[in-house]
Swiss-Prot record:
UniProt keyword annotation of Hydrolase present: yes
Identification of the protein by name: Pyrrolidone-carboxylate peptidase
Enzyme class, broadest EC rank: hydrolase
GO molecular function term, any single one: pyroglutamyl-peptidase activity
Active site: E78, C141, H165
Similarity-based family: Belongs to the peptidase C15 family.
Single Gene Ontology BP annotation: proteolysis
Keyword Glycoprotein: no
The enzyme's E.C. designation: 3.4.19.3
Subcellular location: Cytoplasm
Catalysed reaction, written as an equation: Release of an N-terminal pyroglutamyl group from a polypeptide, the second amino acid generally not being Pro
């Protein structure tokens, strides 16, 4: 199986984004599955276009998008993408999102095709904190998650996709004011999650 795994570039004044740092360090093969790694710009609409082009080029059987969720203490696979965007923080184009629906003709929400409960159980079995999340927010992470689900439901019915949020790195934790996780643990957790998803 070919699996496309994406991570966002730094945004919001940060010099690093654990998403792309962890994705870059994933092995090129997990449990016999080829891992295609892709950096994605933290920009509304452009992020989805970059991933769509990669899907067209690579024709993967699975897509897993990874993003940073400052304030969370666990690796959190997302259950649902919602058809709404909002936010006060500009994206990396310097613009904020236009508040409202992402796709005018899209469903209010799309559920992931990934076995998120099994993924969480496997990550925990590896000794790392994990839990299912029921909200990917309304920023670029949810936007990308929704756009890929919209694409699946219209053009790629056999493609499986989902989104995983990871915590801050220790260097981003503002002297312990926020939860964090080491990069090595993030890579381990994502590897376990991907292996579990690929087996189902």
């Amino acid at each position: 199986m070919k699996i496309l795994v994406t991570g966002f570039d730094p945004f919001g004044g940060e010099k690093i984004n654990p998403a792309i740092e962890a994705v870059k360090r994933l092995p090129d093969e997990i449990a016999g599955n080829q891992i295609i790694k892709l950096e994605v710009p933290t920009i509304f609409y452009q992020s989805a276009e970059v991933v769509k082009k990669a899907i067209e080029k690579e024709n993967p059987e699975m897509v897993i998008n990874v993003g940073q969720a400052g304030g969370r203490s666990a690796i959190t696979p997302e259950r649902i993408a919602i058809n709404f965007q909002a936010g006060s923080t500009p994206d990396n184009s310097g613009k904020g999102p236009k508040e409202g629906k992402i796709q005018a003709d899209g469903l209010d929400g799309y559920f992931t095709q990934l076995p998120i409960k099994k993924m969480v159980a496997a990550i925990r079995h590896a000794g790392l904190p994990a839990q299912v999340s029921n909200s990917a927010g309304t920023y670029v992470c949810n936007h990308l998650f929704y756009e890929i689900q919209y694409l699946i439901h219209h053009d790629y019915p056999n493609l499986k996709a989902g989104f995983i949020h990871i915590p801050y790195l220790p260097s981003q934790a503002r002297n312990g004011r926020y939860p964090s996780m080491s990069l090595d643990n993030m890579v381990t957790g994502l590897t376990v999650a991907i292996e579990t998803a690929a087996m189902c």
